[in-house]
Swiss-Prot record:
Keywords: DNA-binding, Fatty acid biosynthesis, Fatty acid metabolism, Lipid biosynthesis, Lipid metabolism, Repressor, Transcription, Transcription regulation. It comes from Bacillus velezensis (strain DSM 23117 / BGSC 10A6 / LMG 26770 / FZB42). Belongs to the FapR family. Transcriptional factor involved in regulation of membrane lipid biosynthesis by repressing genes involved in fatty acid and phospholipid metabolism. This is Transcription factor FapR.
C-alpha cells in the first residue's frame, strides 16, 4: 500500500529524527520510493543530507572531552560522548578494512571501534581493557556504515573497574556486541 506524500514525509521526519545516520538509499528502500523522491522530500522539509546531519549531531553533543586517549587514537568517528555514560561512533567500512577476496570487514576493525569507544567513554585519564566478552553476529561488507553505541552499565571507582556494553549496528541490525571490563585509576 502506497502512502500519501504527506504521510510519507511525516514518517520520514520521524525516521530521521530517531535514526539520524540513515542514508537516502536506506530510506528509499524503507519507503518503497526512489532516492530522488527521498531527496526532494528532505529538501521540502529542510532536512539536511547525511553528512550535514552527522556534523550537526557531533557539534551538538561533543562538548565533553575524551580523557583517556586522544581523538586520533579512536577507531571510527565519535559523534556523541557523555563521560561515564554513553557514546556513539561511526566507522565507514572501506577497502583497507576488508579482505580483498570477499570484501568482508576484518573482525579486528570492528573490535577496535568498540574497544576504543569503551575506553573513550571512561571519565578518567587512565582506562585500559581488563577483559572483553565479544560476539560477531553477522559479516560486515565494504561500503557499509557501522554505528557503535557504548553504554556504561557499572562503575566501581573504589575497585577501579567500569563495565561498558557496546553494540554495533549496520542500519538497525546488530553486527557486533561486547561487554568490556575496563580498568581505571582509583584517583578520579
Amino acid at each position: 500500500m502506497r502512502r500519501s506524500k504527506k504521510e510519507r514525509q511525516k514518517l520520514l521526519q520521524q525516521t530521521i529524527k530517531s535514526t539520524p545516520f540513515i542514508t537516502d538509499e536506506e530510506l528509499a528502500g524503507k519507503f518503497g520510493v526512489s532516492i530522488q523522491t527521498i531527496r526532494l522530500d528532505r529538501l521540502e522539509l529542510s532536512i539536511p543530507e547525511l553528512r550535514e546531519r552527522i556534523k550537526n549531531v557531533a557539534e551538538q553533543t561533543l562538548d565533553d572531552e575524551v580523557k583517556s586517549l586522544s581523538l586520533d587514537e579512536v577507531i571510527g568517528e565519535i559523534i556523541d560522548l557523555e563521560l561515564d555514560g554513553q557514546a556513539i561512533s561511526i566507522l565507514e567500512v572501506r577497502r583497507e578494512h576488508v579482505f580483498s577476496r570477499n570484501q568482508i570487514a576484518r573482525g579486528h576493525h570492528l573490535f577496535a571501534q568498540a574497544n576504543s569507544l569503551a575506553v573513550a567513554v571512561i571519565d578518567d585519564e587512565l582506562a585500559l581493557t581488563a577483559s572483553a566478552n565479544i560476539r560477531f553476529t553477522r559479516q560486515v561488507k565494504e561500503g557499509e556504515r557501522v554505528v557503535a553505541k557504548a553504554k556504561v552499565t557499572a562503575v566501581e571507582k573504589e575497585k577501579g573497574r567500569t563495565v561498558v556494553e557496546v553494540n554495533s549496528y549496520v542500519g538497525e541490525e546488530v553486527v557486533f556486541s561486547g561487554s568490556f571490563d575496563m580498568y581505571r585509576s582509583k584517583q578520579s
